[in-house]
């Protein structure tokens, strides 16, 4: 078959905060950078990040520094973060937010003109920089404009299907132009995978429609290693009603500004679960507390709890929480006068492509940045660390990808692999009968929410793993579409996305089944305590034939050598 080949030095897959920052950095290093995204450019999930960006600037609390940021991140991550990556994050986050200001981002200020910082969950000091409650939107708009200023070529509405690997090194990616249905090959000397998360594998989620786990699946099939995939964050506060809004994010900034959680009995229940941090305990702790209140009959009739800011000054709410004010006004709730109803919602993948400090994976020439990578956040991500992650490791990935591109020749494309992938992609269109993907997608979301959610058990995880493996091996090859059109065929793209969702969900379920303890966001009702003797480890996933191989690896530590260490006992060198 014939196909179009597009050449670049550095190819970035994904156009969110991490991907665009990587492309900007590569272009600044004078290489030809290109971006491929399945959405319209500028419409990435990053714009939905509302609360803020963590950086130890000490503008509000003068005692803050990178060491406290490091400590809070590792404690918040249930001690299994890759500490080499955490050190990079906390030391470079301040410089990267200054980059954003230079690009044009407008951040809230203190009365003396410095970047303002607010409290966020499980943090010792106020270090979350913000732009009202629209921080991600502000940052993304700035990054998009900088990308355009540098004249970086962007291929939007192009769906990446498989990474191309030649003799152990990256060679590019195969893709479909959604607008035309044409099969394309993007060849590159280096590739940055920045394709975002997989929240859409869950029935209730904050995530955009595009967050279907494409990057996790592509990485696995290419032979890359993934880490911490059992660690899925459920944000404590998503909207409960109306049904069309269920799961939409209610930013942690609401609690950071003083919002209070209470149950149907008007009890401030976080006193029972986290008496010191209360509403600003870790997201894993608050999500489990809310879920337990509902399960034990102390929730609202709609299945949530109340989040109240009506005790705060109306002017403060209008200034610092304008998006939340508008979001709830649309459903008839004035948060200045009455409480919101909230419940947990699928939010963030802590696990993903295993990278080192240079953002390199185990595949030569494949770099990673943003939510598709793992190791930085460990067992639970702190609110505000995600945006910092996108900028710190987006820059590192773009910079190191450019350095590689400057010293290697253009790779060879395996024509047999490309033609085989084209047959797989178009095969679904050519099939005359089989299984419709949309019913399987509904079943997948319900399965993951019910059996691989906030509370997990061995029996349910085994059932989920078995079902997902069966779907992957027996159902995927039988997908049948009603529409045979190649141009803007949403059913076709959803079928291809569903393949990625199923393999990603299977990885999550199998890693969760293997980890026989509770740690961070991973809670096993049959193993409700942490087990540092046996499970102070990371779980690494790699494809083995038609199966998924899992193994334990020691946690990479630098300053904090064992769980439970106090800040004062850490030897900061």
Residues of each region from the PLM?
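Conserved redox-cofactor binding core of oxidoreductases
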Residues: 99-182, 187, 194, 238-241, ...
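Glycine-/small-residue-rich beta->alpha transition segments that form the dinucleotide
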Residues: 188-190, 194-199, 372-373
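Glycine-rich active-site loop/strand segments that organize a redox cofactor
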Residues: 55-89
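Glycine- and aromatic-enriched mobile tails/lids
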Residues: 1, 6-8, 17, 22-25, ...
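Short beta-strand to alpha-helix junction loop
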Residues: 81-94, 127-145, 155, 205-213, ...
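Short beta-strand "acidic-cap" motif of Rossmann-like dinucleotide-binding folds
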Residues: 31-37, 228
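An anion/pyrophosphate-binding glycine-rich loop and adjacent beta-alpha core
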Residues: 41, 218, 224-334, 338, ...
């Amino acid at each position: 078959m014939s196909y179009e080949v597009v050449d670049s030095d550095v190819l970035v897959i994904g156009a969110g905060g991490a991907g665009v920052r990587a492309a900007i950095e590569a272009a600044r290093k004078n290489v030809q950078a290109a971006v491929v995204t399945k959405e319209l450019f500028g419409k990435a999930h990053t714009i939905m990040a509302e609360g803020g960006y963590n950086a130890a600037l000490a503008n509000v609390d003068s005692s803050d520094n990178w060491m406290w940021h490091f400590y809070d991140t590792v404690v918040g991550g249930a001690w299994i973060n890759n500490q080499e990556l955490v050190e990079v994050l906390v030391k470079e986050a301040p410089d990267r937010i200054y980059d954003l200001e230079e690009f044009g981002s407008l951040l809230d200020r203190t009365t003396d003109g410095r970047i303002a910082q607010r409290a966020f969950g499980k943090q010792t000091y106020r270090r979350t920089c913000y732009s009202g409650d629209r921080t991600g939107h502000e940052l993304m708009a700035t990054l998009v404009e900088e990308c355009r200023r540098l004249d970086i070529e962007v291929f939007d509405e192009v769906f990446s299907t498989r990474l191309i690997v030649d003799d152990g090194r990256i060679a590019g990616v195969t893709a479909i132009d959604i607008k035309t249905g044409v099969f394309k090959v993007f060849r590159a000397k280096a590739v940055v995978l920045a394709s975002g998360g997989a929240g859409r594998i869950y029935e209730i989620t904050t995530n955009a429609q595009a967050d279907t786990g494409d990057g996790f699946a592509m990485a696995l099939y290419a032979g890359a290693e993934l880490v911490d995939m059992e660690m899925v964050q459920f944000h404590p506060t998503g909207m409960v009603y109306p049904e069309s809004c269920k799961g939409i994010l209610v930013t942690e900034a609401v609690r950071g500004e003083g919002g209070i959680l209470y149950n149907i009995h008007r009890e401030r229940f976080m006193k029972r679960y986290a008496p010191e941090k209360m509403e600003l305990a870790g997201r894993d702790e608050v999500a489990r507390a809310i879920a337990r209140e509902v399960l034990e009959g102390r929730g609202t009739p709609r299945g949530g709890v109340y989040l109240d800011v009506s005790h705060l000054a109306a002017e403060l709410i209008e200034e610092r929480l304008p998006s939340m004010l508008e979001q709830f006004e649309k459903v008839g709730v004035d948060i200045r006068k009455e409480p919101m109803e909230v419940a947990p919602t699928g939010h963030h993948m802590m696990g993903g492509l295993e990278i080192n400090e240079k953002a390199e994976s185990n595949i030569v020439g494949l770099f990673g940045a943003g939510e598709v990578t793992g190791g930085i956040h460990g067992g639970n991500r702190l609110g505000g660390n995600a945006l910092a992650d996108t900028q710190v490791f987006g820059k590192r990935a773009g910079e190191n990808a450019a350095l590689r591109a400057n010293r290697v020749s253009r790779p060879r494309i395996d024509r047999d692999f490309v033609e085989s992938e084209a047959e797989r992609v178009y095969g679904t269109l050519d099939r005359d009968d089989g299984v419709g993907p949309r019913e399987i997608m509904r079943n997948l979301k319900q399965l993951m929410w019910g059996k691989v959610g906030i509370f997990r058990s061995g029996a349910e995880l085994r059932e989920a793993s078995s079902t997902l493996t069966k779907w992957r091996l027996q159902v995927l090859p039988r997908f049948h579409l009603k529409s045979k059109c190649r141009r803007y065929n949403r059913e076709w793209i959803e079928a291809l996305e569903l393949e990625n969702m199923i393999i990603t969900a299977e990885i999550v379920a199998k890693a969760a089944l293997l980890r026989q303890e509770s740690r961070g966001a991973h809670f096993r009702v049959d193993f409700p305590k942490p087990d540092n003797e046996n499970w102070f480890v990371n779980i690494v996933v790699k494809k083995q034939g038609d199966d998924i191989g899992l193994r334990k690896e020691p946690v990479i530590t630098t300053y904090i050598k064992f769980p439970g260490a106090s800040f004062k006992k850490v030897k900061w060198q």
